[in-house]
Amino acid sequence: MDFALRSLTESVSAEHAATTRKFYETRPRASALAGYDELLAVRAARHERLTGSSRAVVATVNENGHTVPIRIIEPLRRPIAGVLLHFPGGGFYMSSAAADDERNARRADATGLAVVGVDYRLAPENPWPAAPDDCTAAAEWLIGCARDRFGTDKLILGGFSAGATLAATTLLRLRDHGAAGAFGGALLEAGTYDLSEHTPSGRAVIDDYFVTAYAGHVDDRSIPDISPAYGDLRGLPSTLVVVGTHDVVLPDNLLMAARLAAAGNAVTLRIYPDVPHAFSNHPTPVGRQAATAIDTWLLDTLGLGE
């Protein structure tokens, strides 16, 4: 992995940078939630606005004692070339696979990959380890049924924000049971990989409600199943790490990419200039550039690129 400064930040045209900057100048900034009552209100408001895609096939995974809802979106007008198992973001406490339907449908059509979105259980009603248990169950289900259900064993695992954290912990669990090799790659977008108080990045989020909701009951949050940056990262598949320079979790992503590389894994780190958390899901030129680059990486990593 090349950590030379010139290679760290992606090139963005002046026009795209200006248009993207204008979008964020007029967009209200998100603020951290103060507690459970506010979380319930935000969840209710999001639910009222949520309209999932009619293309999504809703199913349930039953694996190792866990029952996990999933949403499957297949590519239109082309055969399934592979499968992306995707964990949505939302601070561990308000994710929804349906909220990603539009994004997942675009990716399915652009790549030929079926996208399986996972509705893992949410904190604080279901704190750690509920979410990684559900994500692991979904991964094990896909490994077992991919050939019969989708006609392919070309699998890739990914997550967005909190979902990227869960993707990393899921891979570590699979690796420990000799199953991580079933996935040809991992897509990690803007995850939080240190929920402890031991590093500056960990201390930066320690007072946020999502930490309390997800893992506030755990005395040592540096355990790898919560903070994967502290884990033994050897033996993981090729990984793409994507983050923006204005993202509060930028240090976490630099740390995770460096530790993955130091452990001998193939790592691609892409940092986009002047964009905040979750930028790749925003309707901006830079967001679209990142999404297209991710599509290409997914196909190349699975050996499906042109």
Locate each region found by the language model.
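Short amphipathic alpha-helix adjacent to the substrate-entry channel of hydrolases
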Residues: 98-117
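Alpha/beta-hydrolase active-site loop
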Residues: 126-146, 294
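Short beta-strand element of the alpha/beta-hydrolase
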Residues: 81-90
